[in-house]
Design a protein with these regions (language model features):
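Active-site bordering "gate/hinge" segments
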Residues: 1-194, 203-206, 293, 327-341
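Dual-mode signal for accessory low-complexity, basic/Gly-rich regions
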Residues: 162-341
Length: 341
């Protein structure tokens, strides 16, 4: 158990009433509606939550902490009845003053939407695929599931026998850090009252750690790294905190400029991922890359590959931002299959 509970600055005393929250949502929506090409709003929202958590365990631990969260989001509509497009922007922070300005969220949602108008179909091909950060984090989510102690104990992960093996190229580092000040996934102790420390899941491309709680560590016969998470009525199970792929050494613009013929993914649909075999197939939308530049919008394609190969070929940009509890920079994966027309 933990002896000294760290202060991670996870609670903002600032309070918004319902009218102020409504005004924030309206401001966000109005800024989206001002952008040329937007035909309607798909809704805007703002929220505030305050949580007080206290844990007492049978082995003598008793401690607690408070968390706050503020968020705003907006979704806009553009195009016509024959080809209607929608997209969004969103921000979430522990402290209200750190939240992105409403005008910026609305404007970004609108610009994202307008840029998708008049999409084209593309032919089936092998192509380099660039994942925008808002969808590249889904790859990190798959990694999180693959290294979760429950998956390893059950044998339902293709990484279960790969500890200390090379999974990625040597530039890839994947970290879980519960101690980030004002972090959306930060916790001063895990949900079994144990001390939590930062650790590398992937270090220089090599698999170094599972995500474990007490139960899964005992099942696997190794030391726990204290990642227990639970609800009010559920048993603890391992879960990441602030998990992220470290920034690489190349910019997003450099990655795109080096691609003659590729696909930039901004949207993913469906759940066609098999964590036992690694087979990966998901519906996608985004933009064609031609001669090193973002070209026209593309929709209704499927991107496919195998996670084992995708991890091995993964290249990361230097644009990591912490917007969620799982965060990733722009990711390039060469030679994926794109199923189009």
């Amino acid at each position: 158990t933990i002896e000294t509970i760290p202060n991670l600055d996870l609670f903002d005393t600032y309070d918004l009433n319902s009218d102020e929250l409504k005004d924030l949502a309206l401001e966000t929506e109005n800024s989206a509606l001002k952008v040329k090409g937007v035909t309607n709003s798909n809704g805007a929202s703002s929220s505030q939550s305050k949580t007080s958590f206290h844990l007492s365990t049978s082995n003598g631990f008793s401690g607690g902490y408070k968390k706050s969260n503020f968020s705003i989001s907006c979704s806009a509509i553009a195009g016509n009845e024959l080809s209607m497009q929608t997209d969004y922007d969103y921000d979430s922070k522990v402290f209200f003053k750190d939240l992105k300005d409403t005008s910026l969220v609305g404007k970004q949602a609108a610009e994202n939407t307008v840029s998708k108008c008049n999409p084209k179909k593309i032919k089936t091909c092998k192509s380099d695929v660039v994942f925008d950060p808002r969808v590249s984090r889904t790859l990190l989510s798959h990694i999180s599931s693959l290294v979760n102690g429950v998956s390893i104990a059950r044998g339902s992960s293709f990484l279960s026998e790969k500890m200390n093996s090379k999974i990625f190229n040597k530039e890839i580092n994947i970290i879980d850090n519960p101690n980030i000040v004002k972090g959306l996934g930060s916790k001063p102790f895990d949900d079994e009252g144990c001390e939590m420390k930062r650790f590398n899941i992937i270090e220089n491309g090599i698999l170094k750690s599972w995500i474990l709680d007490t139960t899964t560590s005992q099942q696997l016969g190794i030391k726990s790294n204290s990642r227990a998470s639970r609800g009010m009525s559920s048993s603890p199970s391992p879960s990441p905190t602030n998990m992220f792929i470290e920034s690489g050494s190349i910019s997003k613009d450099e990655i795109i400029s080096n691609i003659k013929d590729g696909f930039y993914v901004t949207d993913l649909i469906g759940q066609g991922v098999n964590l036992i075999t690694g087979d990966y197939s998901r519906g996608a939308g985004g933009f064609k890359i031609e001669n090193g530049k973002i070209s026209f919008p593309v929709n209704e394609v499927t991107i496919a590959g195998n996670l084992k190969d995708m991890f091995n070929r993964m290249i990361v940009a230097n644009d990591l931002e912490f917007k969620y509890s799982l965060n990733s920079p722009t990711i390039l994966i060469e030679g994926m299959t794109i199923a189009g027309i």
